[in-house]
């Protein structure tokens, strides 16, 4: 008799992806600067650890928030009791104002339109449950975050159809790519319910420009489908062009089609911008009352604790702090990104130009033995197990071109990043030396064969000439 459910035993979780296998390798041999200096450095984790000191400084100056007090009096019992899963009004108000602040206050958000979830993972899955049936499809531009194979598909039964983007235009979405993805879904007899984009992009570290967003809006309008804009990296934009939210474009186009207004949904989180993934704070923002109502009911399976909401409502309500934090955090991200990019360039490795995120999209196509994904995985294994760096291969992100890798830079100390770059540079130098040596040996072998063939032919000619002379002498 079958003891477990089909859901428990299905293979759609994506656990066998090289993205997760790299994590396993790291967990079995984690780098530590003193206890395990030769261990694997984790560069596959998109965490922002660069500004903890700013958060800790605020906490030290605001002890009531951290100790669950209001005006010096304990509110522990109030927070410890069951809370309505709609969320604390003070926190929802502070959160939507913070979201607007990150977007330069070009758009505003209504607290009643937001649904709190236990992180962006929960938010994206909840939207799948709200907008699609099992067997329906969402279109996602490649490369995309490897975790989406788990977050969007595993429990919902929703299918992902890739919108294939290429390096020829910096992996931007094109009209032809959108239409081809839609046709691919139809060929598979899948009903397309929407498009999901990450902006800024994970893994590219780039922002979508207004033209690209309008292209997507034109597409979803013509097809009558939804748009989910995952904007969890919106506060990490450290360079130009700046960040343009889907809500900003929607506001500009709202007079064209009222129905589209209800079919655009934003996913947000404090995991990346504030560096608080352990707090599990995510959100869905939608202009559709039915989506908000349904998502709110579903959020009871993944609530944000009252203690977390209370602490963060105080922090995000401190406008002087949030403005200063956003600016300083972006400066630190820019500095760290430059450190990685310049270090890789010295090793002969280039990156896609980026202006956001906690990672770079690194081009190692020239290090592959062939232009096949098998060659990419072989290179990845060497980098993980021989070099000791866990990075994410492009194939795990469904990239169409072998040889691209996502490399994170904000989840480690500066000294650890420098060590990682030195390791990679040494590996590339050795790889090139080996390749050059192999080519030289190959060339020498060819030369020897050529000389041998020439000598053999000369011997045959000499023998033939000698034989002719003997024949003539005999005559």
UniProtKB/Swiss-Prot annotation:
Q: What domain of life?
A: Eukaryota
Q: Which UniProt keywords apply?
A: Ethylene biosynthesis, Fruit ripening, Lyase, Pyridoxal phosphate, S-adenosyl-L-methionine
Q: Which InterPro entries does UniProt cross-reference here?
A: Aminotransferase_I/II_large (IPR004839), Ethylene_sulfur-biosynth (IPR050478), NHTrfase_class1_PyrdxlP-BS (IPR004838), PyrdxlP-dep_Trfase (IPR015424), PyrdxlP-dep_Trfase_major (IPR015421), PyrdxlP-dep_Trfase_small (IPR015422)
Chemical reaction(s) catalysed? S-adenosyl-L-methionine = 1-aminocyclopropane-1-carboxylate + S-methyl-5'-thioadenosine + H(+)
What the entry lists under CDD domains is as follows: AAT_like
Name the pathway it acts in: Alkene biosynthesis; ethylene biosynthesis via S-adenosyl-L-methionine; ethylene from S-adenosyl-L-methionine: step 1/2
Residues annotated with N6-(pyridoxal phosphate)lysine modification: 272
> What conditions trigger expression of this protein?
By tissue wounding and auxin.
| Presence of the UniProt keyword Nucleus in the record | no
Q: Which GO terms describe its biological process?
A: ethylene biosynthetic process; fruit ripening
Transmembrane helix in keyword set: no
Q: What is its EC number?
A: 4.4.1.14
Instruction: Look up the record and name the cofactor or cofactors this protein needs.
Output: pyridoxal 5'-phosphate
Please describe the quaternary structure of this protein.
Answer: Homodimer.
**Job description of the protein:** Catalyzes the formation of 1-aminocyclopropane-1-carboxylate, a direct precursor of ethylene in higher plants.
Name the record gives this protein:
1-aminocyclopropane-1-carboxylate synthase CMA101
What organism is this sequence from? Answer: Cucurbita maxima (Pumpkin)
């Amino acid at each position: 008799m079958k003891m477990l459910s089909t859901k428990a035993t299905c293979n759609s979780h994506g656990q066998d992806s090289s993205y997760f296998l790299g994590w396993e390798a790291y967990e079995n041999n984690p780098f530590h600067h003193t206890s395990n200096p030769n261990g694997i450095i984790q560069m596959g984790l998109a965490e922002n650890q660069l500004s903890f000191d700013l958060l800790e400084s605020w906490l030290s100056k605001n002890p009531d928030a951290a100790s669950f007090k209001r005006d010096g009096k304990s509110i522990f019992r109030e927070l410890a009791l069951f809370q309505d899963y709609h969320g604390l009004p003070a926190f929802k108000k502070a959160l939507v104002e913070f979201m607007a602040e990150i977007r330069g206050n070009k758009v505003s958000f209504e607290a009643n339109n937001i649904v709190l979830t236990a992180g962006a993972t929960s938010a994206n899955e909840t939207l799948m449950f709200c907008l699609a049936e099992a067997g329906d499809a969402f279109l996602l531009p490649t490369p995309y975050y490897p975790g989406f194979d788990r977050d969007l598909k595993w429990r919902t039964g929703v299918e992902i159809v890739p919108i294939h983007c290429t390096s020829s235009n910096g992996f931007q979405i094109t009209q032809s790519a959108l239409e081809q993805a839609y046709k691919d879904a139809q060929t598979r007899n899948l009903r397309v319910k929407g498009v999901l984009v990450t902006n800024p992009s994970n893994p590219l570290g780039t922002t979508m420009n207004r033209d690209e967003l309008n292209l997507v809006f034109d597409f979803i309008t013509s097809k009558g489908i939804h748009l989910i804009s995952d904007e969890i990296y919106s506060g990490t934009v450290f360079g130009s062009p700046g960040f343009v939210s889907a809500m900003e474009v929607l506001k500009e186009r709202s007079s064209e089609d009222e129905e589209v207004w209800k079919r655009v949904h934003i996913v947000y989180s404090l995991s990346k911008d504030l560096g608080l993934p352990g707090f599990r704070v995510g959100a869905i923002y939608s202009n559709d009352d039915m989506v908000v109502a349904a998502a709110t009911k579903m959020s009871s399976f993944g609530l944000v604790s009252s203690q977390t909401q209370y602490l963060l409502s105080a922090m995000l309500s401190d406008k002087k702090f949030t403005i200063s934090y956003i600016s300083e955090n972006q400066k630190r991200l820019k500095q760290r990104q430059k450190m990685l990019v310049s270090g890789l360039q010295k090793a002969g490795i280039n990156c896609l130009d980026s202006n956001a995120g906690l990672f770079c999209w690194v081009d190692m196509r020239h290090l592959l033995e062939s232009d096949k994904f098998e060659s990419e995985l072989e290179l990845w294994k060497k980098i993980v197990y021989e070099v000791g760096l866990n990075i994410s291969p492009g194939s795990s992100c469904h990239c169409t071109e072998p040889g691209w890798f996502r490399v994170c830079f904000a989840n480690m100390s500066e000294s650890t990043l420098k060590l990682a770059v030195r390791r990679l540079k040494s590996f590339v130098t050795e790889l090139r030396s080996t390749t050059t040596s192999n080519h030289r040996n190959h060339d020498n072998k060819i030369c020897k064969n050529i000389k041998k063939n020439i000598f053999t032919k000369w011997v045959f000619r000499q023998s033939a000439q000698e034989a002719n002379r003997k024949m003539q002498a005999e005559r």
